[in-house]
């Protein structure tokens, strides 16, 4: 049986507010296999972002286990989890979060250089990703000189620079028109399928869900199959 790239087991996550304790995740289980696209839908406030942050090792749950590429992540210290996150997870957000003072190629190369890759090698990898994205002629343009769709394709390339095992996408096409959405998301799907990465996508755009292998929603802190 193929080892999942992500496995959440019995995850509990509670926020403490002035109004009292709010349990967002309650014994939540999730498995994402290599090359699998899993969609997460539901209304705002249902816990989608909390689930993504937990899966991405950005938040620590009160209970449960997180296995990423077979590694028991909650047994690691903060530095260990940070290292795993940088090496094995790629993030794509609704807003591209590109560094405005750097051009496209250096924005993509940045995660590689942070991971210790030499600048020349990092730029070589970034250049090949730009070519796949159809943006080789935009390599030395800063984010402000790119269209919204181009910015998001650069952000996707940056997320894939370290050859992650898992890609986490939070409303990745939320700011794009339908035509650009199809192109950008289609590129993401093609690349992760080729690399065998698992993908967890939270979206309000039901047009994207037709690309998913599974569609889930959160109800009472647990993941269930989404039924239209």
Curated annotation (Swiss-Prot):
Upper classification of the organism: Bacteria, Pseudomonadati, Pseudomonadota, Alphaproteobacteria, Hyphomonadales
Chief location of this protein?
A: membrane
The gene that this protein is the product of is lolD
Q: Report the top EC class in one word.
A: translocase
- What are the disulfide bonds? none
Choose any GO biological process term that the UniProt entry carries and state it. protein localization to outer membrane
Record-listed E.C. numbers: 7.6.2.-
UniProt topology in membrane: Peripheral membrane protein
Q: Which UniProt keywords apply?
A: ATP-binding, Cell inner membrane, Cell membrane, Membrane, Nucleotide-binding, Translocase, Transport
| Ranges where the ABC transporter domain occurs | 6-227
Q: What job does the chain carry out?
A: Part of the ABC transporter complex LolCDE involved in the translocation of mature outer membrane-directed lipoproteins, from the inner membrane to the periplasmic chaperone, LolA. Responsible for the formation of the LolA-lipoprotein complex in an ATP-dependent manner.
Listed GO MF terms: ATP binding; ATP hydrolysis activity; transmembrane transporter activity
User: Which GO cellular component terms are attached?
Assistant: plasma membrane
Annotated family: Belongs to the ABC transporter superfamily. Lipoprotein translocase (TC 3.A.1.125) family.
Q: What is this protein called?
A: Lipoprotein-releasing system ATP-binding protein LolD
**Compartment(s):** Cell inner membrane
Which InterPro entries does the record cross-reference, listed alphabetically?
AAA+_ATPase, ABC_transporter-like_ATP-bd, ABC_transporter-like_CS, ABC_transpr_LolD-like, MacB-like_ATP-bd, P-loop_NTPase
Sites where the protein binds ATP: 42-49
Concerning Pfam families, the annotation shows: ABC_tran
Subunit annotation: The complex is composed of two ATP-binding proteins (LolD) and two transmembrane proteins (LolC and LolE).
User: Among its keywords, does the record have Transport?
Assistant: yes
